[in-house]
Design a protein with these regions (language model features):
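Hydrophobic packing positions in regular secondary-structure scaffolds
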Residues: 1-120
Length: 120
């Protein structure tokens, strides 16, 4: 398998993201997303719904607002729906113990930000 170095923000692509998730390299992907959270909006269409949910939940707290503003309304709604850890079960089934710690749940403020501008 091809190896990717996600620590360089310019290399954060759909392929490198997918490879990191397949390897269960959650900390590596979290670090890359923290350095280039604005790229997530550009990557969003190329990722599967499960990959999108994982990337969204891996974003550090300080990056959520900027990343949410870069997403379309439909993408924000999809990110909002990823608020349950259960949606990540396929990645957590064979992940090392403690892998859940990398996936943070949205705060109430972040959830409200994701719902902003979305008709009820």
């Amino acid at each position: 398998k091809e190896s990717y170095n996600l620590r360089v923000p310019e290399i954060l692509t759909a392929s490198s993201t997918r490879a990191a998730l397949e390897r269960r390299s959650f900390s590596e992907l979290r670090e890359a997303l923290a350095l280039s959270h604005a790229r997530l909006a550009r990557l969003w269409p190329a990722l599967t719904p499960l990959e999108r949910a994982a990337c969204w939940r891996l974003l550090p707290a300080g990056c959520v607002a900027a990343a949410a503003k870069a997403l379309s309304a439909s993408a924000r709604w999809e990110a909002y729906q990823a608020s349950s850890i259960d949606c990540l079960a396929p990645y957590l089934e064979d992940a090392p113990l403690g892998a859940r710690k990398y996936f943070r749940a949205p705060t109430r403020r972040e959830a409200a930000l994701l719902r902003a501008g979305i008709p009820k």
